[in-house]
Amino acid sequence: MATPYNHKAIEQKWRKHWQEHPVNVNDGKKPKYYCLDMFPYPSGSGLHVGHWRGYVISDVWSRYKLLNGYYVIHPMGWDAFGLPAENYAIKMGTHPRISTEANIKNIKRQINEISAIYDWDMEVNTTDPEFYKWTQWISVKMFKKGLAYEKQMPINWCPSCKTGLANEEVVNGKCERCGADVTKKNLRQWMLKITAYADRLLADLDKLDWPEKVKKMQAEWIGKSHGAEVNFKVDGRDDEITVYTTRPDTLHGATFMVLAPEHELAKDLATDETREAVEEYIYQASLKSSVDRMQDKEKTGVFTGSYAINPINGAKVPIWLSDYVLADYGTGAIMCVPAHDDRDFEFAKKFDIPIIQVIAKDGKEIENMEEAYTEASGIMINSGDWNGKESSELKEEAPKIIEEMGIGKKTTNYKLRDWVFSRQRYWGEPIPIVHCPDCGAVPVPEEELPLTLPEVEKYEPTGTGESPLADIEDWVNCKCPVCGKDAKRETNTMPQWAGSSWYFLRYIDNKNNEELVSREKADKYLPVDMYIGGVEHAVLHLLYSRFYTKFLCDIGVIDFDEPFHKLFNQGMITGKNGIKMSKSKGNVVSPDDLVRDYGCDSLRMYELFVGPPELDAEWDESGIDGVHRFLTRFYKLIMDQKDKGVEADKELLKVRHKLIYDITTRLNNFSLNTVVSGFMEYTNTLTAMAKKSGVDKETLETAIVLLAPFAPHIAEELWEAMGHEDSVFAQTWPTYDEEAMKEDEVEIVVQINGKVKGKLVIGAEEDKDSVLAKAKEVLGDKLNGNIVKEIYVPGRIVNIVQK
């Protein structure tokens, strides 16, 4: 009798073997396939079963490609700078460097439990000076190309993390990292001009084999729109206010203007009578987040006391401030057409501002408007020379007319804002800029990089708008690289996204001290073929990575401008009732105990079995027991049958090729949960066949190779048991023969007038006349009327219509 399945002994044996004899070796002859995980930030809580899901999916795909003859680039590293690592260190009362090193050690141990074919020789760590030397090098190159610049501006401010945040880091008005309500703070910031790439970032989405959902999210974030900028003169002053509108055809209906409270003219426009109210309103608005301001709450506002002149008709329009207008979108000022915009209508009604309808269905004005008329088209009314025109046509013509009149210009606008790139924290890459009183902002010479992060005693955020680095005088004070005079270093640090925007390029040449990546290796191994990670990074990391890749392509470092050919977003594994796993909620399931009790192979397969991989799934620990029982049955089947010497008959061949077809098709479609259920079904089928007449060696070996990417340890053990000395991963993925899969006989349904009256077994290739004759025999005396029609759907149904 065969030895029972002992997962502990088998997994220990093969892990040791793989360390000594790696299965994924670059022999220089195979084509490359680059399969990449989104690298983790080393949190203190370690990995839970949700993290495992993505890593298992990527390893299954990598091993599948290995069996298809590729050299697989499958690296791993650490996204270790930034707020998560620093906040954890502060909470634990340790230096972030020390806590980060300890966390990496623990998570690396946990990742190795997965038995993924990671190439640890390629490992990168964003906090390693030899890595962030190149993060700084990229920022210097961007500065020299005019893509990095300083600006005093109101930014998103997290009062808990005590740092500025990019728009992309604010979710529903809260800090993406700590959940605190985000406010606004006016600070000097470093910005990256991602807007210079807006058109390319949008257009090139069409090139990507990515989920449509992600491409749509990026397209909406970039938010391209066409319209016009229109200049309104301020009555009695030399100032002009420019607004951006996508509906220049409604200009005659603009009865007031609204400025963002942060607009540069906001305070200046206040009169003596309104100044106190205006300044109080500006202050209150500064305490709100952008999301709070944009929500559908009752609109607030304050009249400045000043008026602008509508350039199309000379009408005086009052200038208001309201926090529903944001300084960083468009021009920070809008013209308001209350008759045709719900928000403007609500505002006008509240503050008793005139409402002039300029678009009407059939050209008829609505008496006593109760709501805005927001239909996309209609006939122009109350619009001077534009009366009688079709509004949708005028919308296209108006920008040109406005340009010819000299009151504005045709414009394309984007929701995308330049990237706030500085953080007022310690744990990040120092920004390699020196501030000189004479020369201004000057980059640190490239040959002096990396500019290393100094050791500090006190690294907690200050909350003053200055980073803790500002207190280290012997580090801050330096000489200007251009003129040699006394100067000061930039004390803000880069955001966490700086290193993660390009790390995938470094893996393949991580020990190169002369270049970010050699062009030879870049041409040979890049870009990434498959990127696997959570959809929560759709806008942040994925957009930033595309921006960095395009920039590095433009300066000749690489010759491709999109980083990731294919993207797969796995769903989240949640606790009970769909609640996200977190230490604070006490619902984290650690993989460590499950690996001990059931084995790595069982956990790998259960991670795939819980549901479609692209959807969220609720963790139910009882399910892993069923997967473990399946592996036990599979092991027993192989061990019992391996020496029987059975010859393959037609039925065994059919099952073998159907097995190959189903597993391969489901795997290629990323229907990984049905791959596991398929293995279970076919194991039951083969077990039943084994009891009758046995299973041949080739079918057993085929099943082992197919299982290998999913459960590598048991596959290696069984491959060896079949008498092989080489690795199961040195084999070639099996191919199916469609002819061998065909059924000899099929069962069909026999109907009279569409109602089932019996069933019939026929030959798969049997002709129509023969099938109809047999069907009539089955029906017998049930055929008691006049036959009107005989219908045969090959291999499925006979339907006889009688009266």
What does each of the following model-derived ranges do?
Residues 194-224, 260-302, 447-479, 703-732:
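Amphipathic alpha-helical
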Residues 27-94, 123-138, 161, 245-246, ...:
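N-terminal catalytic cores of NTP/NDP-binding nucleotidyl/phosphoryl-transfer enzymes
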Residues 4, 12-13, 17-21, 91-241, ...:
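Residue patterns forming the tRNA-binding/recognition surfaces of aminoacyl-tRNA synthetases
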Residues 1-21, 25-32, 260-263, 272-275, ...:
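Basic, alpha-helical terminal appendages of large translation-related enzymes
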Residues 1-36, 66-75, 99-106, 281-320, ...:
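Conserved oxyanion/phosphate-binding beta-strand-loop segments in alpha/beta enzyme cores
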Residues 58, 71, 263-362, 367-368, ...:
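Catalytic alpha/beta core of large soluble enzyme barrels
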Residues 79, 144-160, 410-441, 496, ...:
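Helix-rich, typically C-terminal accessory recognition domains appended to large enzymatic cores
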Residues 306-312, 316-329, 476-613:
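Alpha-helical recognition segments enriched in aromatics with Gly/Pro capping
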